[in-house]
UniProtKB/Swiss-Prot annotation:
Protein name: GMP reductase
Residues annotated as catalytic: 174 (thioimidate intermediate)
Listed GO MF terms: GMP reductase activity
The entry's keywords: NADP, Oxidoreductase
Amino acid sequence: MKIFDYDDVQLIPEMCIVNSRKECETTATLGKHTFKLPVVPANMATIINEELAEKLARNDYFYIMHRFNVDQLKFIKNMKDKNLITSISLGVKPDEYKLVDQMVQQNLIPDYITIDIAHGHALSVKNMISYIREKMKDQVFIIAGNVTTPKAVRDLELWGADATKIEIGPGKVCITKLKTGFGTGGWQLSALKYCAKTASKPIIADGGLRVHGDIAKSIRMGASFCMIVSLFAAHLESPGKEVEINNCIYKEYYGSASEYNKSEKRYVEGKKELIKIRGSIFDTLKEMTEDLQSSISYAGGKDLQAIKRVDYVLLGDYKD
């Protein structure tokens, strides 16, 4: 199969039909809710916290709260009390089965649950999906991942997932491919394409996006949403620790499988990086919106569907 990544692809424009890029609609629907953009900040401890999740929800952006040292029940109740969408992450450990029971018992069923482990094509994920479905029926939208193959996508959908996350290891602070030899680093976009061809439910591109134009490329290859890490790191609202170097303020961010997040040096597959503080995340979201509107105008349409229909070229050499 042809292997390529974001830098290897350029989209080919169609005739523009709008008078202004502002006419282009960037909204995207996932489950029962529609959001301003088809993007979501990564569910990592240095990317999102309770306060930022609330701000995003109030402004009609999708979020997924991370699962590390968070009182999930308190978080869900707080968001429900404020009439905001509830979106959390779960792993597959025994305590998280108990948490599912507690959610049901306390009538705190969230709108979205993301089952979030490094290798999502696993029996442990199948068992968790089955348990959530048994307890919560169709009251919750289940996102599961992460996976990289069409077979994995088919299995997750068959097991009951409503959407799947695609990637292993292309993120800037992920070192899975270096530690294990496995991953989609260097061919993430083609992995997305081949998985999307098989999928009958939404696909979420997770990681490897470095610039705003990569959102349009992901949509062209079949993504319904894009989970983004580095582009959403180091903002004023970001929970990462501030570090001063040579009179410049940086914020740190690290992978969920890093020793900094796990607080132990076992099965480490992530690292830490510093990024100079960028300003408000809502300024970035505004710029991202404008850039995506431009992408839609180049695609010859008025909404995201136009991007899915454009042709593209592969640049230079690629592996076949």
